[in-house]
Amino acid sequence: WNLLKRYTKRKDLVVDPMCGSGTTIDVARDLERRALGYDLAPSRKDIFRADARKIPLEDEKADFVFVDPPYSDHIRYSGKPECIGELSAEGDAYYLAMEQVISEINRILRPGRYMALYVSDSWEKGKPFMPIGFYLLQMLSQHFGIVDIIAVIRHNGKLMRNHWHTAAVEHNYYLRGFNYLFIMYKPAAGERVPQDRREADEIAEEIEARAVHKDG
C-alpha cells in the first residue's frame, strides 16, 4: 500500500511478475491503479500464466513493478522444475535466473519509474549463510539507481518462542526477524535525481489522516 501511494499515480500500470496469491494486484486496484499479475502457477483467473524470466509485456509499459521472489530452498513452491523457487539459493542457477528476471523488469519498466524487490537472506542448520539480499541488490544496481533500503520487521510469533532463542545460542546464529525491501528507480534520459510521482490530493489525504490519528 505504502509503495503504491508513494511511487505511483492513479491509472498507472502496476506489474507483479511473481504474483502468488494476488495481493499486489488487489491493492493496486483498490488504489485505482491498473494491475497485471503473472505467475508460473496462477492461483486465480485474473493472474496470467507466465515465467518471470520472459514477461509477456511490451517494452517500457509498466509504471511500477513489485517482485517478491522465492529466496531459499527450504520452502516448497510450485513443484515445477522450471520454477525459480525449486532452485537452491546456494547454486549459480538461482542467481542466473534472477538476473534474467531483473533484466526483464528493466525492459518492461518505463524510464522515470520505480520498482521494488522484497527478499530475505537465508540460514539453515548445516548449510552456509546465504546473503541473498546483497547478491540481488548488486544485480539491481546494474540497471537501476537505489532509492532506499528498508528493513521490514516480520511479526512472526514463532521468533518469540523460547526454544528458538535457545537453539540460536546453542548453534551460534542470530534469529532473522526482517526482510529487505529494495526500492529502485529507472532514470529517464538526463535525470540525476528520482522524481516525486505522488499526487497532491493523496499527499494531503495522508497528512490529514496522520494528523487525525495523532490528535486522537
Walk through the language-model features, giving the residues of each.
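Class I S-adenosyl-L-methionine-dependent methyltransferase catalytic core
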Residues: 1-216
